[in-house]
């Protein structure tokens, strides 16, 4: 009797700790419901995370981020807040030069247009749940924050590069460095150009980091572009990367460099996490 009970216990523990396959992705579970996620081979199809949806603390981070973005959006709608919002929730080269480094993060929660907010939060909800269920809520939060900061810095860095390219540092007045007037004039012109550089706001860069992570985890999952066109997720990701690359240097009002910076953050996060798990 005791031997039979011991065998049943061993069989139960073996089943609880062996990997459970969904498509060709592997999710390891244990008695504490902690899990690790990584891909082996090429995953296929749609993934069923329903067994983990009772872990509300993970997916609740998605709602926390949506709520924070909504609160900042509402703050933008009050006219008396306009000066404060422009100072503390827009990131630009001028803002960073004046010591407002926190704007690299706060801009990732900032939307003054409902359509902009809705588009980013709609995307965050669907892709953010994937990452939260696979990697945990804390991981999703960190990825959003880091992706947002990197996206802001990518925007500022690219705008600075474009400004310097249009007006090289070595110019007519630089040949007269001995003349204080020309040096002063160059400094003033540089400051004016810095102030005129476009500021950035929005969660797009942070959301792109999450999209990149999700796409790389599940590259063959079906995604319906605009709810109509079925695409494998890697094709979906490639289309948007190409769109942002082509859009660099255009004046279409879209922060393409920020999008690419966010996507690069998500790709690096995937490589670091996947490499650690495969060891």
How would you describe each model-predicted region?
Residues 5-279:
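A detector for small-residue-rich transmembrane helices and their helix-helix packing motifs
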